[in-house]
């Protein structure tokens, strides 16, 4: 046996073990609390998955808007959705549709086009011939067999400040803009008739020109029409909002919406901030979970405030369309302007650069949010009711569980390991296991 002597580690080992041990302990604690916070909101909405639907109804569907953050790709936004938002939607067994934008302006163009399609279906005149897509084919097939949507309010989940600004811009463009695309500006490079009259060629030059035109014709046939490289240009500018009349199909209150935090910062010099956020994801999970649970339960809505009055007394059930606030009550300090505004400080510097070649080009991410009082008054936000907030607190304390169910008894660690890696079975599996009698007849029975 070798002779091992117990002694304290050296100074360098003490520093290494202290740093790595502290970081590991902070990471393990944060992930444990993050999982507990997410489980609290999942248990709050899990009773919705137990509710049965008639065979001729489809599940309530939410619309999720997400786009690539400035300076990064779409994968980061997808991971944020899957990590913080999707678990709560899955716990409630809700259907959702994701609208993604890889570049600036795609969310705005996509939302505006959806609203224009709705207005055309409502009977507003338009010269645009719509192409039949997959969604229209599925909707027609469901209508023929008598399948309808669940009669509950819908909602929009908007992830990130840049997506929120495009969402606001798309709402105004869709409801206040024209249904037909505007005429493209006339090019200034067209030669004048006088210039064409001055160039008079001799008769001998005519055959040569005809031969050259014949040679160019095959080359033109091979050319394919170029596809648009960016999102559809806006049909209306923010300066024209006030001059447009409201369409007949505009409802008294729009579908409720919920903006979701998406903190994202890049850069080597911002490493301390990134480490701090990496070790404090439990706070983000709790905040995002509260917002997502509010739109999933859809029990209470409130209008977006303008800073001139309190919104605590204006909570209304989500199934009732609240009357929009009058235009003269809405000041200039809209709540929609400042939501998630702190995220703009973390954007990459390339997002704030202006296009020198086209300085007048609209930038949805950089330009300030412009709101029309008629649209802003119809916007609603889903919030948790005081009853749901109190129930979530009881769930976190362990005094309550999923609505209508009792909290299961905790299973010891050794038993979980035996069930997972050994030959044991949990009680629920044993209950479902069929009891088979003596089918071989060994006991002469």
Curated annotation (Swiss-Prot):
Function text: Essential component of the TIM22 complex, a complex that mediates the import and insertion of multi-pass transmembrane proteins into the mitochondrial inner membrane. The TIM22 complex forms a twin-pore translocase that uses the membrane potential as external driving force.
Gene name per UniProt: tim54
Membrane topology (Mitochondrial intermembrane): 30-445
Membrane-spanning ranges: 12-29
InterPro entries in alphabetical order: Lipid_Phosphate_FormReg, Mt_import_IM_translocase_Tim54
Name under which the protein is recorded: Mitochondrial import inner membrane translocase subunit tim54
Lineage: Eukaryota, Fungi, Dikarya, Ascomycota, Pezizomycotina
Disordered: region residues: 175-252
Cited Pfam families: Tim54 (PF11711)
Compositional bias segments (type: Polar residues): 197-209
Biological source species: Aspergillus oryzae (strain ATCC 42149 / RIB 40)
Record topology, Mitochondrial matrix segments: 1-11
Oligomeric form and interacting partners: Component of the TIM22 complex, whose core is composed of TIM22 and TIM54, associated with the 70 kDa heterohexamer composed of TIM9 and TIM10 (or TIM8 and TIM13).
Family: Belongs to the TIM54 family.
GO cellular component, one term: mitochondrial inner membrane
GO biological process: protein transport
């Amino acid at each position: 046996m070798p002779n091992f002597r117990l002694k304290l580690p050296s100074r360098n080992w003490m520093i290494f073990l202290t740093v790595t041990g502290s970081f590991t302990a902070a990471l393990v604690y944060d992930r444990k609390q993050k999982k507990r916070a997410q489980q609290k909101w999942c248990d709050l909405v899990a009773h919705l998955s137990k509710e049965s639907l008639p065979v001729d109804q489809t599940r309530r569907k939410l619309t999720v808007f997400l786009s690539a953050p400035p300076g990064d790709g779409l994968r980061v936004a997808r991971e944020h959705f899957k990590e913080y938002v999707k678990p709560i939607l899955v716990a409630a067994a809700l259907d959702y549709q994701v609208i993604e934008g890889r570049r600036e302006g795609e969310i705005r163009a996509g939302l505006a086009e959806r609203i224009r399609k709705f207005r055309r279906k409502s009977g507003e005149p338009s010269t645009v011939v719509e192409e039949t897509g997959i969604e229209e084919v599925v909707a027609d097939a469901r209508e023929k067999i008598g399948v309808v949507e669940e009669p509950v309010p819908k909602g929009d989940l908007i992830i990130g400040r840049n997506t929120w600004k495009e969402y606001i811009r798309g709402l105004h463009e869709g409801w206040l803009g024209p249904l037909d695309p505007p005429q493209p500006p006339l090019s200034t490079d067209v030669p004048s008739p006088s210039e064409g009259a001055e160039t008079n060629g001799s008769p001998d030059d005519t055959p040569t020109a005809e031969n050259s035109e014949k040679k160019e014709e095959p080359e033109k046939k091979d050319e394919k029409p170029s596809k648009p490289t960016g999102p559809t240009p806006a049909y209306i500018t923010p300066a024209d909002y006030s001059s447009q009349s409201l369409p007949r199909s505009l409802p008294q209150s729009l579908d409720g919406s919920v903006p979701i935090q998406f903190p994202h910062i890049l850069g080597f010099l911002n490493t301390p901030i990134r480490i701090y956020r990496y070790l404090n994801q439990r706070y983000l999970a709790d905040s995002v979970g509260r917002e997502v649970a509010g739109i999933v339960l859809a029990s209470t809505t409130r209008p977006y405030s303008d800073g001139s009055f309190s919104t605590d007394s204006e909570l209304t059930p989500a199934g009732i369309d609240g009357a929009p606030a009058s235009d003269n009550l809405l000041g200039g300090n809209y709540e929609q302007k400042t939501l998630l505004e702190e995220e703009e400080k973390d954007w990459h510097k390339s997002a704030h650069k202006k296009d020198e070649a086209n300085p007048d080009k609209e930038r949805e991410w950089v330009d300030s949010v412009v709101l029309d009082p008629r649209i802003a008054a119809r916007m609603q936000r889903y919030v948790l009711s005081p009853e749901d907030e109190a129930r979530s607190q009881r769930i976190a304390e362990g005094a309550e569980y999923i609505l209508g169910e009792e909290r299961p008894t905790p299973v010891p660690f050794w038993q979980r390991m035996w069930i997972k890696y050994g030959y044991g079975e949990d009680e629920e599996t044993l209950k479902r296991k069929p009891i088979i009698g003596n089918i071989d007849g060994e006991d002469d029975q």
